[in-house]
Amino acid sequence: MADNYRSRIVTQGTQRSPNRAMLRAVGFGDEDFSKPIIGIANGFSTITPCNMGINDLAMRAEAATRLAGGMPQLFGTITISDGISMGTEGMKYSLVSREVIADSIETVCNGQSLDGVLAIGGCDKNMPGAMIAMARMNIPAIFVYGGTIKPGRYKDCDLTVVSSFEAVGQYSAGKISEEDLIGIERNACPGAGSCGGMFTANTMSSIFEAMGMSLPYSSTMAAEDAEKADSTEESAKVLVEAVRKQILPSQILTRKAFENAISVIMAVGGSTNAVLHLLAISRTIGVELSIDDFETIRQRVPVICDLKPSGRYVTVDLHKAGGIPQVMKILLVNGLLHGDALTISGQTIAEILADIPDQPPSGQDVIRPFSNPVYKEGHLAILKGNLATEGAVAKISGVKTPVITGPARVFESEETCLEAILAGKIQAGDVVVVRYEGPVGGPGMREMLAPTSAIIGAGLGDSVGLITDGRFSGGTYGMVVGHVAPEAAVGGTIALVEEGDQITIDARQRLLSLNVSEEELTRRRNHWQPRPPRYKTGILGKFAKLVSSSSLGALTDLNLF
C-alpha cells in the first residue's frame, strides 16, 4: 500500500490530471505521485538572528526527505522578533504570531492534503505555533529547532541579549559607563541562533524534545554548528518513516508527555511562557491539563540545571554537559518521568535514554546531581488569591525575598512603568502593578522584559515586586508575577488596584493578595467600567475579540461555537 495516505486525493485518478499537471511543474515525475508529500514549514527570516540560519536547514531537510522516499514541498511561515519588538507596540504582535503561525501551517498542510510536516523555527512563538498546528491536524509531524546562539563576550564575561536589557538599567542607575553600555550592546549577540539562556525559545525546544516531537539532543545544539544540520537531515528521515508507520501527534502528545514536559521545565529552570503554551497545546490536542498541574509537579521536581537568566550558564553549556537526555535520565531514574511515553521515532522515552548515565558527568556543574540540586523544588509557582482567582505564574528561582508586602505603584502600560523605573521613582519595598497588558487588554499580552531588567539593573531585584496581566520574557527573573487572571480588561481584581494599596506576594504560600476589604472591593467593582477596545480592526482587533484567558492558554479558537 502506498504511503501517500492523504495526498492521494490530489495525485490519484483521472480526475486529478490537472492537479498532477501543476505538480509536474514543481518537480514531480511519474514515479513521485505515489510517494508521501512532506511539507517543510520554513520559518526563515532575516528579521531576527533566531531565524536567519534556518533556510540552510530547510534545504538540508528537503534533500533528506527526497533521499528517504518522500516528496518535499517547502512553504514559508512568519516570525516576530520578540527581542527587537520588546518594549514597543510591536510586542503586541508576538503572542498573536503564535496563532498566525499555527493557522498558516494548518492552512497549507490541510489545503494541500500533505501527508506529514517538518516545521523549522527559531524565535519564541515559532515552537508553540507549530505544535498547535500539529495538534490540530494530527498528521505525522516533527519539529526542528533552528538552534541556540553562542554566548557573546565582553570584559571576560559571557553575554546574552538579556545582558543588554539589564545594562540599560545599570547605566540609568549610574552603575556602568556609556562605553560599557555600548560594549555590551555590540557583543551580546555574536551570530545566528535563538537567545542563549534557558529563555523561552530554548525552553520550548527542550519541551518538544522531552515530549518526543523533536530528536534527542537537537534542542540544545548551537545554530552555527555542523551537528545542527546533520540533526535536521535525520529529522527528515525519521518523519518519512513516521508517515509510513502513521505515528501521529495524538499518540505522542498524551497526558504523560505533558507531565514529562513540565518536569523537564522545572529541572532546567525554564520560562514562565511554557505554562501558557503547554495549556494551549494540551487543549488543542484534547488532553486535560490545568494551571494547577504545574504547581503539583513543581513541588516534587528540583531545579538541577544552573542556567541563565538566574543561573550562571547558557544553553550551549548544557549541551556540552549532556543536554536534555542527561536531564531526563536523572529524572527517569528518580521516578519523575514516564518512560513509556512514545516519541516520533517510534521508540519510548526509556528506550531512547537506555544508554545515558544515571549521573551527570564529572568536571562540570551545569547539570547537578539529583542529591545536590540548585533548588529543592521547581521554580515556576502558581499563585492564587483575590488578585488572581484563576491563577498567576511566578518564577521564584533566585528570589532572596520570597515574601513582599508593599504599596502598589500602578501603571496602565509597560511604557509608563519603564519611564518611572528609569527616572528613579520606584523604591525598595514597592510592588509595581502593570495592567491592561493582558491577552484582551493589550491586546497581545506583551512581555515586561524592559521593566524587569531595569529593576534588576538598578539593584532593586531583591526588594521590588512586579505583577502584571501581561507576560514575562524567558530572560526575566526576580520577584515577578505574570499571567494574572482574570485580566484587567475583563474586570479582574487587578483592575481595581489603587495607588498605595498594600499588596502581598508570598511565594512560600503561593499567595497573591490585595489587602483591601471585600466591602471596598465590591464598591470599586460596582464603579468599574470596561475600557473601549484599543483596536477595532486588523489582526489585533480579531485577537482581542477571540482570545481566551491566559489561564486557558490564550487560544483564539477555544469555544468558538
From Swiss-Prot:
GO process terms (BP): isoleucine biosynthetic process; L-valine biosynthetic process
Cofactor note: Binds 1 [2Fe-2S] cluster per subunit. This cluster acts as a Lewis acid cofactor.
Residues of the active site: S473 (proton acceptor)
InterPro entries assigned to the protein according to its UniProt record, in alphabetical order: DHAD_IlvD/Edd, Dihydro-acid_dehy_C, DihydroxyA_deHydtase, DiOHA_6PGluconate_deHydtase_CS, ILV_EDD_C, ILV_EDD_N, IlvD/EDD_N
Modified residues (N6-carboxylysine): K125
Molecular function GO terms recorded: 2 iron, 2 sulfur cluster binding; dihydroxy-acid dehydratase activity; magnesium ion binding
PANTHER family per record: DIHYDROXY-ACID DEHYDRATASE DAD (PTHR21000), DIHYDROXY-ACID DEHYDRATASE, MITOCHONDRIAL (PTHR21000:SF5)
Function of the molecule: Functions in the biosynthesis of branched-chain amino acids. Catalyzes the dehydration of (2R,3R)-2,3-dihydroxy-3-methylpentanoate (2,3-dihydroxy-3-methylvalerate) into 2-oxo-3-methylpentanoate (2-oxo-3-methylvalerate) and of (2R)-2,3-dihydroxy-3-methylbutanoate (2,3-dihydroxyisovalerate) into 2-oxo-3-methylbutanoate (2-oxoisovalerate), the penultimate precursor to L-isoleucine and L-valine, respectively.
Designated name of the protein: Dihydroxy-acid dehydratase
Species of the source: Microcystis aeruginosa (strain NIES-843 / IAM M-2473)
Gene: ilvD
